[in-house]
Regions:
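Elongated alpha-helical scaffolds
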Residues: 110-114
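Compact, glycine/acidic-enriched structural inserts
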Residues: 75-98, 118-148
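Nucleic-acid 5′ end/cap handling module spanning
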Residues: 2-5, 12-16, 20-22, 26-79, ...
Length: 194
């Protein structure tokens, strides 16, 4: 029996972060604790809007506050100043918070797959449909740091079939297909892939 889940937490800190951010501020209100909800057996989720979670991925938020980019690691409940590879561009609106997963690809390349938008210019995106949040995220994709990329999000049923058939390939092991909900950071498992 495996007692500890394998994650990339240590590598995440080394790659994405510099110094801890210990001062108080607006960022403390943006502690996102992502939750993966179990499969809802009563409802078919094949037409749900979602993406995949990588095996061993580490949840991260990347946010712009004044002139700083902060990285929040929910597994450690800690904020850090972003490393140069993760810094958001000056064009990124202040008080904008992105949600993604830190993964290490098969060739040992670290990256952040950003798949949701939590806040834009301080306005909460809670209760906004996932498709609308993703459309806004796509428009802001050019403001992400070099290690970040906008993750593909679409119909879960199609994604699950394509992953299982091998027609849709990603450079890391996929744990599951998940549906985004109206709350950023809350995803429902549609099907396990690993």
């Amino acid at each position: 029996m495996e007692l500890l889940r394998k994650t990339h937490a240590h590598a995440c800190v080394l790659v994405l972060c510099t110094d801890p951010c210990l001062h108080p501020g607006d960022h403390l209100k943006d502690r996102i604790q992502p939750k993966t909800l179990p499969i809802d057996s009563g409802k078919p989720q094949s037409d749900a809007f979602g993406t995949w979670l990588a095996l061993g991925a580490e949840w991260v938020t990347i946010a712009k506050y004044d002139d700083s980019t902060l990285v929040y690691l929910p597994s450690q409940d800690s904020f850090y100043y972003a490393s140069p590879a993760c810094v958001l561009s000056p064009e990124c609106p202040k008080r904008t918070v992105f949600l993604g997963q830190f993964v290490i690809d098969s060739d040992s390349t670290p990256r952040v797959l950003v798949h949701d938008l939590v806040r834009l210019q301080g306005a909460s995106f809670a209760d906004m449909p996932a498709r609308e949040r993703y459309a806004c995220l796509q428009q802001l994709g050019g403001t992400l740091g070099g290690i970040c990329t906008v993750q593909w999000v679409g119909e879960c049923g199609v994604l699950g079939k394509e992953l299982k058939s091998g027609r849709f390939k990603v450079p890391h092991t996929v744990q599951s297909v998940v549906a985004l909900t109206t709350v950023p950071g809350r995803v429902k498992v549609v099907e396990g892939v690993h």
